[in-house]
């Protein structure tokens, strides 16, 4: 089991299919992960994902859902 403290700034975030969806900007209260707005997938906006989507953390943050589903469900922050 990972801890939210295992998630570090600038880590790559990938879906369960191994495809890149973003880069960690920071975590919020141990409940959400903010992705950077400068990433190629971000379209110039920050995005929030639930910490519950995280399956495990090594050098990357691996989600428990495919990249397309995660990008459809993430919260865009203006």
Task: Describe the residue ranges of each PLM region.
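Peripheral interaction segments used for macromolecular assembly
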Residues: 1-78
């Amino acid at each position: 089991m990972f801890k939210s403290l295992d998630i570090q700034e600038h880590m790559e975030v990938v879906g369960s299919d191994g495809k890149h969806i973003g880069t960690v900007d920071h975590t919020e209260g141990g409940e959400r992960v903010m992705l950077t707005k400068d990433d190629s997938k971000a379209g110039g906006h920050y995005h929030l994902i639930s910490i519950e989507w995280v399956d495990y953390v090594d050098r990357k943050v691996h989600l428990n859902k495919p990249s397309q589903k995660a990008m459809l469900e993430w919260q865009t922050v203006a």
